[in-house]
Amino acid sequence: MAIRARSWRPPPPPLLLLLLWVTGQAAPVAGLGLGSDSELQIERRFVPEECPRTVRSGDFVRYHYVGTFPDGQKFDSSYDRDSTFNVFVGKGQLIAGMDQALVGMCVNERRFVKIPPKLAYGSDGVSGVIPPDSVLHFDVLLMDIWNSEDQVQIHTYFKPPSCPRTIQVSDFVRYHYNGTFLDGTLFDSSHNRMKTYDTYVGIGWLIPGMDKGLLGMCVGEKRIITIPPFLAYGEDGDGKDIPGQASLVFDVALLDLHNPKDGISIENKVVPENCERRSQSGDFLRYHYNGTLLDGTFFDSSYSRNRTFDTYIGQGYVIPGIDEGLLGVCIGEKRRIVVPPHLGYGEEGRGNIPGSAVLVFDIHVIDFHNPSDSISITSHYKPPDCSVLSKKGDYLKYHYNASLLDGTLLDSTWNLGKTYNIVLGFGQVVLGMDMGLREMCVGEKRTVIIPPHLGYGEAGVDGEVPGSAVLVFDIELLELVAGLPEGYMFVWNGEVSANLFEEIDKDGDGEVLLEEFSEYIHAQVASGKGKLAPGFDAEMIVKNMFTNQDRNGDGKVTAEEFKLKDQETKHDEL
């Protein structure tokens, strides 16, 4: 049920001295003392173990009773009306014997009371109901006590060690509760609905006692709030489950707290000493996170998926609170971002995130880049003689360690015990590496940082390189073999023989077969007269050269077909 405020009226004026109904129901009575039928007698048939409060003169009580004569004949019962008897004690609103008998009772205590005529209805009796000079017996069960001077009572039975913030007026809260009467009878529970009660505090959305009882609570705190009826639903009750003049007891556990004026809060957990760059709007981030509610309830984690969350920031791809909270982070930084619901998933929530929930994200930034980034090169060592620099077409042998920006090692040629060998500028490595190996001399050591759009992109390499990852390569160039001029796969180191075809055609039949051609080219390379492009399959180069000369494709080259490159620009051979 909703704990909403109702219009409140002060306690009613005193009841009549003799509480009689036209229906013939007499006011319940009880007494205090022992002795004969001429004295008030009380038998305490049940006393609860805990009795924090007893009835005093001036208190207002709610109790059930059964009234009988000594022979057992019933003359009245509150149970028959399915309603407690509600009255002030010690103010003359009851017969004297009952006024005395109720004093000292505990809630849930049961008393059997014998009231002599002089403390009941005396020699007059009640016409048609109670004969003159009747001894009256009452079986009384006390349900409720309060006093018009009572205030809200608060008992905190659990308080978390850390309490950075407490409920203030105008805060919005989410809490669970069990609502009972003073006798322990449950009338409502948010737990049964499996949904928190969500409301503003101190602006009249709640009954006055709850508005007051919630103030000062911490998230995670548990407290008992006891509310007298004039700060709850008053003399009329709520018209459904709560009777009039009922004291209410709420066992409250606070789960969440925020104010509509709140922004995000950021707590830096780990900030690297070296932070050369901080994230800005438009950057693309890869980060891990654990997501919890304010009370610690887990709702999501990138770690459980074994994959970072990858997104642009500052462009509306994530909730506003995270968009803001990820600005200004360093690579490797860990921070806690607390996001109020109006900067999170709002009143509706999403999935297992309830509506109006404050969210807590523990973030670990793995890397970030900007789509406009190029590679970054830092040279750590250059030999004294660093005049021959790598260029397109050169054949390179180098060692490297490949890692992510957070230091996670991906690959290492040193661990494999062999160099990595490529021809520069022929797409044998990712574009960023190709760029990073340019203008490098043998013996040089450098670090190349490659953004994903110049590396392995959004897809990455399954099981090896995460998607959208910035890569860091520590490189040492060990060997450089100069390449050939662009467009050539073979060049002569000296003058070309005027009788080149005849030299290749050793058998003099006027036709050169692939075997003859291959043997001749390899002989020229071996003698230093010619040079094949380094880093490529020599046989494939020779075969391509032969194919280019074999213009009719009959598997042999004639003198008519044979041309040098400078004689036939359409072909790359020789």
Swiss-Prot record:
Residue numbers binding Ca(2+) 2: D550, N552, D554, K556, E561
Motif (Prevents secretion from ER): 571-574
Residues that coordinate or bind Ca(2+) 1: D505, D507, D509, E511, E516
Alphabetized GO MF terms: calcium ion binding; peptidyl-prolyl cis-trans isomerase activity
Pfam families with a match to the protein in the record: FKBP_C
GO cellular component, one term: endoplasmic reticulum
Main location: endoplasmic reticulum
Annotated signal peptide: 1-26
Reactions the enzyme catalyzes: [protein]-peptidylproline (omega=180) = [protein]-peptidylproline (omega=0)
Gene3D superfamilies per record: 3.10.50.40, EF-hand
Alphabetical UniProt keywords: Calcium, Endoplasmic reticulum, Glycoprotein, Isomerase, Metal-binding, Repeat, Rotamase, Signal
PANTHER family, sorted: PEPTIDYL-PROLYL CIS-TRANS ISOMERASE FKBP9 (PTHR46046:SF2), PEPTIDYLPROLYL ISOMERASE (PTHR46046)
Protein name per UniProt: Peptidyl-prolyl cis-trans isomerase FKBP9
Gene giving rise to this polypeptide: FKBP9
